[in-house]
């Protein structure tokens, strides 16, 4: 068992999993074994059931984040924007759901249909992929290291510029909430913490 008693030292580690694969007992055991942060692919506030192949629900996502926080483990929630059936209304549901879950950190990515997967094949058939077979378009830059990823997939109701707008809007609404900022200030314990949060907010503001 990976506990300090058995190892003879404190091992700090992070993990990634699905919201439908955890329970309270497991998370408390992981915390005791040194787990610092859990990352979850929550993906969407409307289409989570479809994305996860019918195995995950919004309720499971809520429970997983609540249980993880109760175990004193930080969380990262990953969300997708720009699925083929996406509309401004479904994006709004994703942003609102992300704020409701209130993970320690949230990442919003524009959907990337890599050649060879089901989403790519469907997008090609429906004419939603804007691609000239240049593989450099599949290199993810992300917020903070070059801005929002330029979409290669559009939807029937959202253009590439619309998707970029909504991805930036998601970050703005999530990280610049007064309650989120206040909570981070309460966790500052050193100048190193202050610098880390300051640099993070400055980076986000620059890319918005």
Predicted ranges, named:
Residues 189-191, 197:
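Secretory/periplasmic and organellar redox-cofactor proteins
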């Amino acid at each position: 068992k990976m506990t300090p008693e058995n190892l003879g030292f404190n091992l700090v580690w992070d993990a990634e999993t699905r919201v439908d694969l955890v329970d309270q007992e497991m998370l408390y055991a992981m915390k005791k074994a040194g787990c610092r942060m859990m990352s979850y692919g929550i993906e969407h506030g409307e289409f989570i059931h479809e994305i996860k192949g019918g195995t995950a629900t919004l309720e499971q996502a809520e429970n997983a984040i609540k249980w993880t926080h109760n175990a004193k483990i930080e969380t990262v929630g990953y969300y997708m924007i720009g699925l083929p059936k996406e509309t401004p209304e479904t994006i709004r549901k994703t942003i609102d759901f992300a704020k409701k879950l209130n993970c320690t950190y949230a990442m919003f990515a524009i959907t990337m249909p890599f050649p060879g997967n089901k989403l790519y094949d469907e997008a090609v058939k429906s004419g939603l992929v804007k691609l000239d077979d240049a593989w450099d378009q599949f290199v993810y830059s992300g917020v903070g290291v070059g801005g929002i990823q330029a979409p290669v997939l559009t939807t029937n109701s959202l253009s590439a510029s619309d998707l970029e707008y909504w991805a930036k809007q998601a970050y703005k609404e999530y990280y610049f909430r007064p309650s989120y900022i206040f909570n981070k200030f309460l966790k500052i314990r050193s100048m190193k913490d202050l610098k880390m949060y300051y640099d993070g907010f400055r980076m986000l503001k620059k890319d918005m």
